[in-house]
């Protein structure tokens, strides 16, 4: 039997030297574009189902909206392809799908509000969907702007103290303003100007995450210093508790002066998780949990709004027509949805107050059922896991803590929201990331996404190859005549 013929040189060209060149690293940008197209398809079909159920007529305008949505995120995709080519290909499509589903649900609730107004001969309210679309466009501008301007995320560490100060000021401003310029539904969390309302706490949490990531890296020895051992765990020394006490006092101040339980809980929990990641000490978690319990007990004893929320959580049907109406309607809506849901546009989610903001999870559970709600939660889970995977893969400590802090912010916020609407924990007023109606939350989430993508790009990029010093050919090497040393005469 004859030996097999060697492969032709045309099929496998060999460069000089006989070694094949290394293939270029994969950026997965084409996969990202395909996933964006799939997300657009899901959003368009969802819009079709809502229109068919509510309006009983479907026009080609739905396809135009779908194409416009795809074009908007295609621009974001091009920015990622140009300025973060090695970033995780799942982060942007997941955010696009969540944002799109949120727009569909807000539009569905707008139609319900219009029907209710027409039935009662009230003025038709202006739709909130148009405003949310505008904020989505502004979010894309912020997202692309961060990708373009921030060439290296490690630059943020140089300005960490400035960013931390700005974050603290942003948290404090609503408490200092008169109620007419800052208060809504009892919470002073807004800055209201003519034609503009901003919730600075949404942006402050990102600035504070950057600050704490830098401090935990620079002062790591302070947080990991040898302390006391108890029950097999190492606890920090009393004099090293200053930083976490400062964070605790700031969060208590937010709770006291702004009546914002959600933001104070979110910031303290995120800092506590980052502290544990930086030190790997369970003692910090125990101390943080104790401080959290002390703060809640103090707030319950001192402030009526905390007592009301706690009593509503424990006994939602005791005052059904007043304080318990929100959570009761939320539970009824989730029960109505069952496993498969009533179908998009076929439920009655507008019965729940603040269905577009605090209770949009209830809308999902009612119309898409437990299966649909689980699918949405799975999207968030994948987003958080990919963010934590970025934290593990990135090479520098600041990037690790930054990515972990941003990822856990989304995870903790989602847990607090879902726990509130399902009566697992008291209601806090936080909104669902990327989905709930609101400009400040959406813009801040796209800024968070841009930072996470920049860290992911650095984590997945191939390590730079160090150039070797050129070696002169042997023919061009200089020749030196060495003379054998003469033997020294013995004395």
What does each of the following model-derived ranges do?
Residues 74-78, 211, 297, 301-305, ...:
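Transmembrane alpha-helix boundary/anchor motif
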Residues 238-301, 313-315:
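Hydrophobic alpha-helical segments of polytopic membrane proteins
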Residues 17-69, 74-258, 418-432, 437, ...:
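Membrane-helix boundary/helix-loop-helix interface segments in multi-pass membrane proteins
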Residues 391-429, 435:
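Loop-to-helix entry and N-terminal half of a specific, functionally important transmembrane alpha helix
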Residues 226-240, 387-408:
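Membrane-interface helix-loop-helix junctions at transmembrane boundaries of multi-pass membrane enzymes
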Residues 171, 181-197, 276, 284-376, ...:
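Hydrophobic, glycine- and aromatic-enriched re-entrant/interface helices and adjoining loop segments
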Residues 1-27:
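Short, Lys/Arg-rich, polar N-terminal cytosolic tail immediately upstream
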Residues 67-72, 134-142, 366-385:
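Hydrophobic alpha-helical transmembrane segments
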């Amino acid at each position: 039997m004859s030996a097999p013929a060697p492969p032709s040189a045309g099929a496998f060209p060999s460069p000089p030297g006989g070694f094949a060149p290394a293939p270029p690293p994969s950026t997965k940008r084409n996969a990202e574009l395909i996933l964006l197209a799939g997300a657009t398809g899901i959003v368009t079909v969802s819009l079709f189902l809502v229109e068919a159920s509510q309006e009983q007529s479907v026009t080609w305008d739905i396809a135009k909206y779908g194409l416009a949505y795809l074009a908007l995120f295609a621009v974001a995709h091009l920015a990622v392809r140009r300025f973060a080519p090695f970033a995780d290909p799942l982060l942007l499509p997941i955010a696009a799908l969540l944002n799109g589903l949120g727009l569909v649900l807000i539009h569905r609730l707008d139609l319900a509000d219009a029907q209710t107004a027409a039935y009662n001969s009230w003025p038709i309210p202006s739709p909130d969907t148009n405003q949310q679309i505008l904020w989505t466009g502004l979010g894309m501008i912020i997202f692309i702007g961060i990708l373009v301007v921030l060439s290296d995320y490690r630059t943020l560490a140089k300005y960490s103290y400035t960013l931390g100060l700005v974050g603290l000021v942003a948290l404090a401003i609503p408490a200092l303003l008169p109620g007419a310029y800052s208060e809504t539904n009892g919470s002073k969390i807004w800055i209201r100007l003519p034609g503009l309302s901003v919730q600075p706490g949404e942006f402050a949490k990102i600035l504070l995450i950057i600050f704490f990531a830098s401090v935990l890296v620079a002062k790591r020895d302070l947080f990991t210093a040898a302390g006391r051992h108890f029950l097999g765990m190492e606890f920090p020394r009393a004099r090293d508790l200053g930083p976490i006490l400062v964070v605790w006092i700031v969060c208590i101040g937010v709770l006291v002066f702004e009546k914002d339980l959600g933001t104070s809980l979110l910031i303290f929990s995120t800092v506590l998780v980052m502290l544990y990641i930086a030190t790997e000490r369970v003692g910090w978690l125990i101390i943080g949990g104790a401080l959290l319990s002390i703060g809640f007990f103090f707030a319950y004893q001192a402030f009526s709004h905390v007592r009301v929320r706690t009593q509503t959580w424990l006994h939602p049907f005791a005052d059904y027509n007043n304080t318990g109406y929100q959570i009761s309607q939320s539970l009824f809506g989730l029960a109505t949805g069952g496993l498969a849901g009533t179908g998009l546009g076929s439920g009655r989610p507008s019965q729940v107050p603040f269905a577009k903001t605090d209770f949009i999870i209830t809308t999902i559970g009612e119309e898409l059922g437990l299966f649909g709600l689980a699918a949405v939660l799975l999207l968030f889970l994948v987003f958080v896991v990919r963010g934590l995977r970025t934290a593990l893969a990135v090479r520098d400590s600041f990037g690790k803590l930054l990515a972990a802090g941003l990822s856990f912010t989304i995870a903790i916020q989602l847990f607090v929201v879902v726990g509130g609407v399902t009566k697992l924990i008291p209601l806090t007023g936080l909104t669902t990331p990327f989905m709930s109606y609101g400009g400040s939350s959406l813009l801040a989430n796209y800024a968070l996404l841009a930072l996470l993508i920049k860290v992911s790009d650095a984590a997945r990029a191939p390590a730079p190859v160090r150039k070797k010093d050129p070696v002169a050919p042997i023919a061009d090497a200089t020749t030196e005549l060495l003379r054998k040393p003469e033997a020294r005469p013995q004395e």
